[in-house]
């Protein structure tokens, strides 16, 4: 669709919304930007150069105020808002900012989705893709809005996009040359309602693929594996736990590729800097993706050896008085935090809690009972988590009134040889703007406690 002179409504004036406006201006669209926050509460609006008549701010609008042919939704905006529902009824198209950025872009596009591991996988693919010498953009749900960046790339470029279920929910004609679905476990059920709806949103990454494209799937995840017969693209499987007849798997301590009856060793686990068996999912998916770019095994293995991981994902803060501190603030659901718990053999003092996303904590507490020496709970979900801990028979837990108190309690519980792990299993939105802010504050508190210069 040519958007020149088309009226387009952008809902949400955060990072994605502002990037969408800039992209739409370049495409010659007639833009209306709406956000329920007042102008004084928003940043970056004046730089857009939109006249007052194109800004509808400070309230949730009626459809007649913002009626448009296309609605571009920011990821955090609920499509159930009445004016959006009326727009759908009136025939307006709904796109995510990702759809706007990538729908007609000529670059080679690699999309990564899944409940957990997206950011690590996306970042690793980006680092490996740069070894091709081609211009490479890493963006999406990873913190850089795609619409802000894509104009600088042509058909020689590579785009590696982390894609959330919110972003994929409203794609229309977006086609990924390589689509990756890492795993699916209950998450964002407050938005999607059911696990089936959540999976359906994730699976849209494959919807417009053709037989010349590649779909990379986790063999070990039954829900993900079951998608394979329904996909048009060539399917490549990976398994972090077994040797597959065809695909990426493990043989002893090695990551290998089984293909056409031949097994090719790729790298030994001991050569990798990423800890935890769950990171094998991320590594195998990344290998499969960059093989589509024609990288040699030597280039891939050197890139894997060099990769140290991503900030706020099992990030080593430091060892102080014999205690190892790990920042896993990106663990925003129980499944992600469970994987972090299995990454360490040392006794663990766990800091958990924050804002729940409508998820149950009882299975998580069963893992905590096996893997955790002491549990410190904080945030609005603390009472719910405490009840689940009691129901599971956990006795060694503490409640903190503030995040700073939680860190001090964890330090007091820990002994030399222990790990103090921040992996909250909840979002940060009750106390912080983002998981990044939470992780930075954790690191600051630890260093301040041990009087290390910040």
Swiss-Prot record:
The keyword Nucleotide-binding applies. GO terms for molecular function: ATP binding; UDP-N-acetylmuramoylalanine-D-glutamate ligase activity. It catalyses: UDP-N-acetyl-alpha-D-muramoyl-L-alanine + D-glutamate + ATP = UDP-N-acetyl-alpha-D-muramoyl-L-alanyl-D-glutamate + ADP + phosphate + H(+). Its main location: cytoplasm. InterPro entries: Mur-like_cat_sf, Mur_ligase_C, Mur_ligase_C_dom_sf, Mur_ligase_cen, MurD. Cell wall formation. Catalyzes the addition of glutamate to the nucleotide precursor UDP-N-acetylmuramoyl-L-alanine (UMA). This is UDP-N-acetylmuramoylalanine--D-glutamate ligase. The gene is murD.
